[in-house]
Amino acid sequence: MLVNAPLSADTENEVRTKSEDVDPNVMADVLKAVIARVKKIDRDHDIPYIAGYSQNGEKIYIDRHMPKSAKLGGKRVQTDRFLILHEAVEKALLDELGLHYLHAHQIALRTERAAVEAEGHAWREYNAFTKAHERQIDDENLKKVPDDLDLTPYRNEKDFQKLQQMVAAIKSEE
C-alpha cells in the first residue's frame, strides 16, 4: 500500500522547504512532486468533468478542448498542473484508502485550491474559468473516450446518461 512506502533519498530531496505550517513554498514542492509521479498526461480525448485518470492510475486525462492556460489576475497562467494535482490526489484516495468518490473529490478539490492560492491566484477566478469550461465540455458530443478511463466518478455521481454516452464512444473507437 502506498501509505506504507518508505522514504527514499529522492523523496527527501523533493522537500526544499521545511515547514509544518501552511506554506506556499511547501505547496510548490508538493505540486512538483505529484506531477513528477504521473507517467503520462493525455490531452487527446473527450473527458467529461474536464479531467480524469486511467484505471491503473498511470495516466491523467485532460479534455482535448480544455485550454492549457487561463488569464488570472491579468496574467496568463498554465493550469494543467492544478488539474493533474486534483486527479492524482483523487485517484490515490480512491485506490489506496478506498474512499467514496465524493469524499476523495472534496479532498482533491481543496488540495487543488491550496495549490492555486499558494501561487497567489484567486480561487474564485480560477474556479470560474474551470466551471465555464466544464459546462462546455459536459455539453459536447463524446467522440474520443479512452478505453481505460476510470469510470468510478461517473458511476458514483449516478450520471447514467453520461456513462452511456461514454461507453458508446469507447465502442465506436474500437
What are these model-predicted stretches?
Residues 1, 89, 113:
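Residue-level marker of positions within ordered structural domains that often coincide
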Residues 9, 84-87, 109:
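Exposed, low-complexity/repetitive linear segments and helix-based recognition motifs
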Residues 1-15:
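Low-complexity, glycine/serine/proline-rich disordered segments
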Residues 82-94:
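Active-site recognition of the HExxH zinc-binding catalytic motif
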Residues 12-79, 95-174:
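Metalloprotease/metallohydrolase-associated module, dominated by Zn2+-dependent proteases
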